[in-house]
Amino acid sequence: LEAYRRGALAERSLTAFDAESGRKLWTRPGNYQTRPIIVGRTIFAEPWFFDLAGGAAKTGPQGKPLELFRGSGCGGFAASAGTAFFRAGAICYRPFDAAGRIAPLVSGQRPSCWISFVPAGGIVVAPEGSAGCTCPYAIQGSVALYPKDLPAETPRPADK
């Protein structure tokens, strides 16, 4: 994380355009690692968060920039409204709030090297992505996670 704080990837920038006219709205240095994603009115570009409307860095309760740095792992991020899903040694997640910690969803299972999570409607689906990989992970299989209190009208995986 210190390398990013020093500007290790300062040549990477973020630019926003008006969708109707194509006019450039703003541009700023990004200094980010992976492809940015947009969640609501926020751009997340590992390890930073930026305001979509003006490009300003988002800050936490103490006025410090919000950060989410996974430490290791390749591949992109996927996100729901409040949580990032990514590869960091296993299938991991972290709430976007400043106090959230990175936690494994499923230990021993490796997602693919590319974006391989689908968080939508309260459900997270992670298709198998390690077959043929040289990384040593024990579990090869797809995962679908949903809360116990999912409303009855929501489609569920078939009961066996």
Residue ranges: model-predicted function:
Residues 1-15, 27-49, 69-91, 110, ...:
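Repeat-blade elements of multi-bladed beta-propeller folds
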Residues 13-32, 54-75, 97-109, 113, ...:
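Aromatic (tryptophan-biased) beta-strands that constitute blades/sheets of beta-rich domains
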Residues 94:
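Catalytic-site beta-strand/loop segments enriched in glycine and acidic/polar residues
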